[in-house]
Amino acid sequence: MAQFLLTVLQVLLALTFWIGIGSGSSNHYNAGDHVPLFVNKVGPLHNPSETYQYYDLPFCRRGPVIEKQETLGEVLNGDRLMSSLYKLKFREDKTHFVLCRKRLTSSDIARFRDIIAQDYYFQMYYDDLPLWGFVGKVEGDYFGQGEKHTKYYIFSHLKFNVLYNADKVIEINSFSDPSYMVDISENTEIDVQFTYSVSWNLTSERSETRMNKYSRASFHPISQKIHFFSFLNSITVVVLLIGLISFLFMRHLKNELRSYSIGDEEERKEAGWKLVHSDVFRCPRNISWLCAILGTGTQLLILIIALFALAFTGFLYPYNRGMLLTSLVIMYTLTSIVAGYTSTSFHSQFEGNKQKRSVRLAGILYPVPFFIILSVLNTVAITYGATAALPFGTIVIIILIFTLLNIPFLMLGGVLGNRFGLLEFQPPSAVKRNPREIPPQNWYRRKLYQVFLGGFVPFSAVVLEWHQLYASLWGFKIYTSPGIMLFTFIVLIFLSSSVGIILTYIQLSGEDHEWWWRSILCGGFTAVFMYGYGVLFYLRSDMTGFLQLSFYLGYTALLCYALFLVLGTISFLASLMFIRHIYRSVKLE
């Protein structure tokens, strides 16, 4: 199975490399060439999921608006690029060029005041480079005629500073000039002249590195300090766990194996893991569901590895519109073959039939919760008129991808797993017909305590880095340190495996042979802590409103559910290898 998974991973890496090559910008311009500036969306600063189309607000517009043709990933990302009245020709400076003269009605003014109070920002794209700006500002309270007042201003002048190298655009920044503000504190109609300026400057920076400016935030001293403490915290937990494992294997378990193998009768009489050798490999309950979890968890693990490969090759950089979501759709579809292959391979070791049920369950285990949550969130977005609402055509495309590509790949993996998968499982000892009765357990061997500990230890080692990830996903901090993220993920895998092995050994030492499902729960429960921390993160943030709350909880649930399946699978596989090793090392009668 390892060779099959390696082959699939190689195909994915080749595909992601091809995707990344196609995503690069290679636009060349001559002086005076028109370079279109597209307006994208607007929204409150603290609610990243609550965005609306640019022209939903009473900005300058003239005639029909041309919508830019977008990719699937851009639509899923909530991008809605449209043409604008801004004319930024290559290497052509402009000073106080009139964009439009607009009469703001009382309703327009009320709308602007409302969005300015919520710190609305706008986003634009120029030669695939993002730029932002604020709509207006609120000035401090003042007292007049015994009443408290607040001043609202709208920015009427926008400055563009563009850097170029030879015939390519390298960087663009926008500045809302505070010298040109219009007071809209009163509900009276007002005429506003919107203007803009453009200045071009030569730079020595190459076009290949023009996106690096969006990564510099990750190397801010404060960010580096947080990463350092996260690294130190992870290393501390890993070292402590390595010491515990060394004690377990080098002293306690090794002595048990030696004494049991040489026929020490006193050792044989002791209660412990040795007494359940004829039950520990008994076919677990709900084998189809267990194999489906293993298949889906392995699929998602391969997908995560492929994403890291994309990040390290530089194809997943900040604000590369839709690249991440496009990659996720393609890679999840292709890795469905892994889910079918893995679930069938494990199922065939215990039962010679009913593998089809495992494949079907693997096909719905993650997609069904995903589509349910997506449908609810899409309904909420449609109600609010947000750009996160998926058009009908996009929904049809997603359904077609799932039915015409995802399901066939899943079935193909099931066929390959049935024919070329793992051989029938041969336990080191014969399995008794009747299961051994499980004696009463001490409190530290009970399921609740073990599952809690199995989730808490790995989470405590990565909590600082997990906070940074939340801040990147739901704030405006840029997480572009794939090396640190990969290190954190490796630590998470190591701790989930190690803690799973230790807890499985403790469970078997209490003569409790039903370890299969508990090992999955112990590993996956880390994701429950992650979701709980996500709720705490939301409560401490400035996010508000039902739309943002629903998207935050929904997407966080999907992320943590995926990690539950991945970490549960890792914990199970580590426990399975450990159990096979210790029972093969014993000379059973």
Curated annotation (Swiss-Prot):
The chain crosses the membrane at residues 228-248, 292-312, 322-342, 362-382, 395-415, 451-471, 483-503, 519-539, 551-571. InterPro entries: EMP70. One of its GO terms (biological process) is response to nematode. Its main location: membrane. Expressed in the root cap and in giant cells. A motif (Endoplasmic reticulum export signal) lies at residues 578-583. It comes from the Eukaryota. GO terms for cellular component: endosome membrane; Golgi membrane. It is found in: Endosome membrane; Golgi apparatus membrane. The C-terminal KXD/E motif functions as a Golgi retention signal, certainly through the binding to the COP1 coatomer. Belongs to the nonaspanin (TM9SF) (TC 9.A.2) family. This is Transmembrane 9 superfamily member 5. The gene is TMN5.
